Amino acid sequence: MVIQKEKKSCGQVVEEWKEFVWNPRTHQFMGRTGTSWAFILLFYLVFYGFLTAMFTLTMWVMLQTVSDHTPKYQDRLATPGLMIRPKTENLDVIVNVSDTESWDQHVQKLNKFLEPYNDSIQAQKNDVCRPGRYYEQPDNGVLNYPKRACQFNRTQLGNCSGIGDPTHYGYSTGQPCVFIKMNRVINFYAGANQSMNVTCAGKRDEDAENLGNFVMFPANGNIDLMYFPYYGKKFHVNYTQPLVAVKFLNVTPNVEVNVECRINAANIATDDERDKFAGRVAFKLRINKT
């Protein structure tokens, strides 16, 4: 014989719910007395307080082993990469000469990027260094802080400096300037005490034909040793990265050209297929003309 469970009315359900929330006979709130709730809250307060203290202690111990100025592990930063400016999403520099909006954003980015390189700012913050040698500043047991940096003046970029330039870095005339910079690696002695320079070329034969002629600033794409080593952001507060500007003079219009620039230095490998940015950078250049 099947016994059917009596169906509760809506009023009964509400009354049972109200009694569960607060039972005036037993003085229980949601099934527990005040003392029981106090013990529960005390337990979780102690439990999470202990976890917080353990986490804080662990972080403090770990931070004691980490330098504020130099990364502890740098094995994956042995070879600096190259990057370009203006910075674009896909390393594509596309210029429509007749459309100001297509290149004005590049010009604005370059103006902001090159502002710290103004000669007046460099003269205030940085030193005139002796070229052809590293600018070493050892601590010798005493923290030598902050480190001084060598001047890299905007005027060294010649026709790509943008100073008094009505062509806007050449973008308005279809002869754009692209800036190459080497990523910073702490205590890296670039060039292994030998001169180094940046070279650019088309990636394929057809790219080389369409790339045409170009000039580089400083001359021959040279990067002087005096800008190395780099001691880190906190030590080298006013450090100014050296740049190489490439001005493309007669790129074949309306054709996408693949360009690759490399740093030629004794201790920088540029043939690692696993890291296509190690010592080199590839980008696409297109000059549209109607």
UniProtKB/Swiss-Prot annotation:
* Principal location: membrane
The family note in this entry says: Belongs to the X(+)/potassium ATPases subunit beta family.
UniProt comment concerning the protein's domains:
The C-terminal lobe folds into an immunoglobulin-like domain and mediates cell adhesion properties.
Cross-referenced Gene3D superfamilies, in alphabetical order?
Answer: 1.20.5.170, Na, k-atpase alpha subunit (2.60.40.1660)
Q: What does this protein do?
A: This is the non-catalytic component of the active enzyme, which catalyzes the hydrolysis of ATP coupled with the exchange of Na(+) and K(+) ions across the plasma membrane. The exact function of the beta-2 subunit is not known.
Specify the protein's topology with respect to the membrane.
Single-pass type II membrane protein
Give all cystine bridges in this chain.
Answer: C129-C150, C160-C177, C200-C261
Spell out which residues lie on the membrane's Cytoplasmic side.
1-39
Q: Glycosylated residues: list them.
A: N96, N118, N153, N159, N193, N197, N238
Q: What is the lineage of its organism?
A: Eukaryota, Metazoa, Chordata, Craniata, Vertebrata
Highest taxon of the lineage: Eukaryota
Q: Where is this region: immunoglobulin-like?
A: 193-290
Which GO terms of the molecular function aspect are on file? ATPase activator activity
Q: How does it assemble?
A: The sodium/potassium-transporting ATPase is composed of a catalytic alpha subunit, an auxiliary non-catalytic beta subunit and an additional regulatory subunit. Interacts with BSG.
List GO BP terms, alphabetically: cell adhesion; intracellular potassium ion homeostasis; intracellular sodium ion homeostasis; potassium ion import across plasma membrane; sodium ion export across plasma membrane
Name of the protein: Sodium/potassium-transporting ATPase subunit beta-2
* NCBIfam families registered for this protein in UniProt: Na_K_ATPase_bet
Matching entries from InterPro entries are given as: Na/K_ATPase_sub_beta (IPR000402), Na/K_ATPase_sub_beta_sf (IPR038702)
* Keywords assigned by UniProt, alphabetized: Cell adhesion, Cell membrane, Disulfide bond, Glycoprotein, Ion transport, Membrane, Potassium, Potassium transport, Signal-anchor, Sodium, Sodium transport, Sodium/potassium transport, Transmembrane, Transmembrane helix, Transport
Compartments, record wording: Cell membrane
What's one GO-annotated cellular component? Answer: sodium:potassium-exchanging ATPase complex
Query: Which residue ranges traverse the bilayer?
Result: 40-67
